[in-house]
Amino acid sequence: MPLRVCVLGGTGFVGHALVKRLAADGHSVTVLSRNMALHPERLLPPGVMVRETNVYDPDDLQIQFAGMDAVINLVGILNERGDNGRGFRRAHVELTQFVVSACRQAGVRRLLQMSSLNAGRGRSHYLKSRGEAEAVVKASGLRWTIFEPSVIYGIGDGLFTRFGQLLRLAPVMPLARADAKFAPVFVGDVVEAFRRALAEPRSVGEVYELYGPDVFSLAEIVRMTARQLGMRRWILPLPDALGRLQALAFDHVPGKPFSSDNFRSLLTDSVGGIDGLHRLGIEPTRVAKILPDILGHANDKQARYARFRARHV
């Protein structure tokens, strides 16, 4: 049955793919954005509307939620300004409180919440705030479902694509927490999990750990990226003392490619215990199947840029 769905974070990596899929399923999708000019509706799939909204204004949220059948909150950040946890609390905890309150006031009963594997079980502000946000959702009285993914990969991701960019810069990569473990999950599988849970009443009150079938160390992920790109690179694992110093230095680099809070997150392996994908009837996608597309896409963009520079510079 077609639903009216409001999505927060619908313009991000996961959100873009999810919104497209929900629209293809026939749902009426409203995406809340701080700046509509960045997302002209002519570029959106049929059935998707963007509304300019201050998501930190509970009254504005209530207005936008009116008449919706479900709300999906995908908002999340990996870094904050400074290192005191305030940015994470605002993006994860306070916003979730506003969303829950607005759902109640608008009469929306269904809430799907993005979280993270190890939410509430780690030393980082990121993981702590994710756990606090989950507690807000669980106490909301709404018909909620929570998703806890490991690191998410796909075309344009912040994992293989980002490491591909970094590997091009130097023959040596000093790597903090090189032995940290991940079970990367494909963005398409995450989207399918949200899609199925939205249509499945038995998903109400459930927490789904979303992770892939393969477990890799951080060093193995970097090596896979280099091999796929045909590069020979030396990975230099850093002891934790040097890794902390590296993170501290990057705290002051614009864009924070790595941070002290990222380092603390890496102290907890991002691997699951209860397979949420199989619980939803989804066969997890293996990295080897998608990696050529991810890095091939990145190579195509690099080649197009090189051709542009050759013509115009």
Regions found by a protein language model. Name each.
Residues 115, 134-158, 165:
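Conserved beta-loop-beta element that borders a ligand/cofactor-binding pocket
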Residues 27-34:
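Conserved glycine-rich Rossmann-like NAD(P)H-binding loop of the short-chain dehydrogenase/reductase
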Residues 196-259, 272-313:
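Mid/C-terminal beta-alpha module of Rossmann-like enzyme folds, strongest
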Residues 158-159, 177-199, 206-209:
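Substrate-positioning beta->alpha
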Residues 89-93, 112, 130:
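Short alpha-helix in the Rossmann-fold core of NAD(P)-dependent oxidoreductases
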Residues 2-27:
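N-terminal Rossmann NAD(P)H-binding glycine-rich loop of SDR-like oxidoreductase domains
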Residues 38-98, 102-105, 117-122:
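NAD(P)H-binding glycine-rich loop region in Rossmannoid oxidoreductase-like domains
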